Amino acid sequence: MELLTFRDVAIEFSPEEWKCLDPAQQNLYRDVMLENYRNLISLGVAISNPDLVIYLEQRKEPYKVKIHETVAKHPAVCSHFTQDFLPVQGIEDSFHKLILRRYEKCGHENLELRKSCKRKVQKGGYNEFNQCLSTIQSKIFQCNVHVKVFSTFSNSNQRRIRHTGEKHFKECGKSFQKFSDLTQHQGIHAGEKPYTCEECGKDFKWYLIFNEYEIIHTGEKPFTCEECGNIFTTSSNFAKHKVHTGEKSYKYEECGKAFNRSSTLTKHKRIHAEEKPFTCEECGKIITSSSNVAKHKKIHTGEKLYKCQECGKVFNRSTTLTKHNRIHTGEKPYTCEECGKAFSRSSVLNEHKRIHTGEKPYKCEQCGKAFRQSATLNKHKSIHTGEKPYTCEECGKAFSRFTTLNEHKRIHTGERPHKCEECGKAFGWSTDLNKHKIIHTGEKPYKCEECGKAFGWSAYLSKHKKIHTGEKPYRCEECGKAFLCSRALNKHKTIHTGEKPYECEECGKAFGWSTYLSKHKKIHTGEKPYRCEECGKAFRRSRVLNKYKTIHTGDKTPKCKGCGKAFKWSSYLNQHNKIYTGEKL
């Protein structure tokens, strides 16, 4: 008869083997060893060397204590583990369920069973032990060198505690299944933060959070999605990334709707409960999230805590300031792998990628038209509803979007906040500035597959394609005339309405379109920004410059179909054609 010892239900690691385990595996080791210790104590087995237990509870390296020195002192309790208690197939099943689910790294073919527990036993002592033994749970450690299996024993009382959650912490009443979790939880009440980052000095309560935080300094991103190649610094963020699997593990029993994040489920529950606990006293707006209350209040108070040291502009949020700072630094950390173009924001990069993929995920339910951006879809929807809730106080013109109204107001104020860094020219709209920049870069990334013509802006390409298709979707309700683009239709409408909202402050002359007013103003200012590189002559309009250039090149492209005569300018050709039509010149 041999005594049951702590060594029979334990596993030893050398310092080299201990380093092979990751933090999660080390924590699992501590939990199992401490549970084995408590199970032996409950069976009446006294441990002669408690130093190992103390080391484990203090989260010190266990290999500093010799496990074989911990000898059982109770003669009545002995061990007799046969293959009936530890079937190989059962171990393999446990291996697949526990390790493959948790680590997904190795197979069961390299499994080593510990067979040191085959011993003879007194019949009475065995029966006493067998009565206390309710389950055998196989715990497995995975190491780069080898895999070991060992068992933990739990009597019926301890098993009942595990299922009913009777391990309570007296301070707050919270219960835990593992002793290490209880120890870590006690640190919250004590304010203890035992894990300190050597790089920046930040303290943490939990080892796992500390371990993931250290990766920020190294720049390491160990979690890679095999489906799309996205990389993550933490396992929690990687777990949240379930785009490809479509997995939605958080289900609401009320309506059956499922979500891939618990936070989204919590927000959804408020819809059913009609829980809208936060109401703004200033404007009456209902806010479902407490975190957004303080942010919303800053709209009314005008509080802007975050100031840009470069230009003095202030912001409500630190994240907005960070994005703004990139304007001054020129930082563009997000680069397109397809064309090499860089962006200051990841969201803009994601939208840009759709140019290459052709993806248009936002579809209009009314007409089926698809868009790359959700904002463009929202603008498009106003075409069907005809709703225009935003009205200009200056001229009474109505708009479907608030941003469009703000842009319109610049017509009256003359404000041009968007300035070209290359030539200093200012624009009232950012879109016009972006179009203008192409003049300096010469970039034309949008190419027509039909004829090969390239354009600097996607909108120009879309308009150009209609030439090949003959599509003219914008029709005048007054006379039925159709146009390729909405802007041309709006210009045409002024013929019927006689509306001329754009008035020159210098001479009072009015125009139906802002571009005509801009061209007209150059008469008063004498500005001639378009200069001929050949002779230096300057012009107010680019079109006139292009016509003038034919003098130097000798190009006479417009030809009369009747007589074949060529002209420098198309306007001369039009006048010439009147000879044949009999129209008065």
From Swiss-Prot:
Source organism (scientific name): Homo sapiens (Human)
Location of the KRAB domain: 4-75
Predominant subcellular localization, coarse grouping: nucleus
Subcellular location: Nucleus
Regions annotated as coiled coil: none
Gene Ontology MF annotations: DNA-binding transcription factor activity, RNA polymerase II-specific; RNA polymerase II cis-regulatory region sequence-specific DNA binding; zinc ion binding
Pfam families (UniProt xref): KRAB (PF01352), zf-C2H2 (PF00096), zf-C2H2_6 (PF13912)
UniProt family annotation: Belongs to the krueppel C2H2-type zinc-finger protein family.
Keywords: DNA-binding, Metal-binding, Nucleus, Repeat, Transcription, Transcription regulation, Zinc, Zinc-finger
Summary of the function given for this chain in its UniProt record: May be involved in transcriptional regulation.
Keyword Metal-binding in annotation: yes
Record protein name field: Zinc finger protein 732
Top-level taxon of the source organism: Eukaryota
CC per GO annotation: nucleus
GO biological processes: regulation of DNA-templated transcription
InterPro entries: KRAB (IPR001909), KRAB_dom_sf (IPR036051), Znf_C2H2_sf (IPR036236), Znf_C2H2_type (IPR013087)
Family matches, as SUPFAM superfamilies: beta-beta-alpha zinc fingers, KRAB domain (Kruppel-associated box)
ZnF bounds (C2H2-type): 141-163, 167-189, 195-217, 223-244, 250-272, 278-300, 306-328, 334-356, 362-384, 390-412, 418-440, 446-468, 474-496, 502-524, 530-552, 558-580
SMART domains the record matches: KRAB, ZnF_C2H2
